[in-house]
Amino acid sequence: MRSRILAVGAVIALLTVACGNAGSDKNGSVPQTTKPGTPPITEVTGADLKKNVPLSGVQGVTDDEIKVAVITAGSNPLAGDYTTYKDGIQAYFNMINEQGGIYGRKLVISSDRNDGFVNNQQTVKTSLAQDHAFATFIASPLFYGANDIANSKPQMPTFIWNINQEFAGKPNIFGNVGALCFSCTGQGLPYLAKSQGFTKVAVLAYGSPAASKNCAAGAKAGFEKYPSAQVVYFDDNMRLGQPDLSAQVSAMKDKGVQLITTCVDQAETLILAKELAKQHLDAVQNLPNSYDPKFAADNAQYFEGSFVAPQFASFEYKPLLPTQEQFIEWMGKLNKRVFEIPAYGWINALQLVHGLKLAGPEFSQQKLIDSLNQDTAFDAEGMIPPIDWTRQHNDPAGPNGTTNTEVSGKYICASTVTIHDGKFVPLDDVPEGKQFICMTGGANSPTLTETPEYMRFGPS
């Protein structure tokens, strides 16, 4: 049941948020463009954004509202409250609604459902049958309802926090990143080890589910292809929720491990961190899905020097983008915390509105889907590396751990930070004004990046 969050730990935790070719625009300014060969499409602006055209037969739309449904894993045994995804959506909607909405209509969350972690498919089916929303937002480790979304009639525009392999191949489902590669061999961990001077690495994973073992195998393969450090300890047979890691830590201490990459959940990383402290092993972790200031502060003594990389520009890299400042402001107005999961809600709410602006005042669900699928550089106003929706709905996995660059993204970037005194701090090597560390040489580069490109995708 924990498979998605485990797999994504390997895919996105360090410099592997997108499979593809590293970009060459060092300024990072990427205009939104249109699929070659199609009529140009641009966002509606000015007075047209206020134009209220009566729409007949468009599901979830009235003369004064655009209704959306939200599905999250509220009853979630993994660390992190997925219901906070809705907070980011609501914050963005509040900002747009205060400006008068779009096309004379307010954006409204009309349904909020908890899929109970294991009931995603049934919850999706119920929402599709009963909520009659214009669009759906989903954040759940298990996306078993993906095929129901893909086969919905009318096609349901759906926006997810993408940590799910079920995302791939469904053109009406959009995410904060494109389709992820769950088997590609990446430069991320080897580059991290090299840049930080680590030479001895450990990899930990559960024996079941298979995704955890695959994650560990991918991490190990990365160091075999790019041998910046040696994997001196490897255990992919841990038990789910294993409470005692004393044997593993003792073995790692004997091997002189400096960096630990894990394919386990957040709760397990804390168990590991406490055991590291108990045995006085001065090793740091690569932490998946842990960009949460409260988690870092509450466990400051255990995670000093560990690394975290959200799927967006970390707020520690200044100056902040205008949309980052807006996110902080409008989350504050909701009296909600600023951290990783709500930020994905904000990004995807922005993407919905972007799609509406592309579709125009006479919008429909299908027009919104078609419009977004012409966008070759959606970057959420700079918060994420640009997504090419003409390519990145497709699974980028190639044979033998390679990436199919015909359908992968252009950039291999992450916005990695480290934990110091219970706070996230930027890496020293990143120049002021840049927010992302990007690999060079392409997704299938035969050699490890020597000098990365430091990029910023939004305005300075």
Task: Describe these PLM feature segments.
Residues P54, G80-D87, E98-P171, D236-S246, ...:
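Beta-alpha junction/loop-to-helix N-cap segments that form part of ligand/metal-binding clefts
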Residues C19-S29:
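Bacterial lipoprotein signal-peptidase II cleavage site
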Residues E43-E65, A69-Q90, D112-V118, Y206-C215, ...:
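Extracytoplasmic "Venus flytrap"
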Residues G178-L180, E275-W346, L358, E450-G458:
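Extracellular/periplasmic periplasmic-binding protein-like sensory domains
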Residues M1-V11:
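N-terminal export and membrane-targeting signals
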Residues V53, A133-D235, V284-V308:
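Extracytoplasmic ligand/sensor domains, especially the bilobed periplasmic-binding protein
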Residues K333-P342, H354-D428, G433:
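Segments of small-molecule ligand-sensing domains
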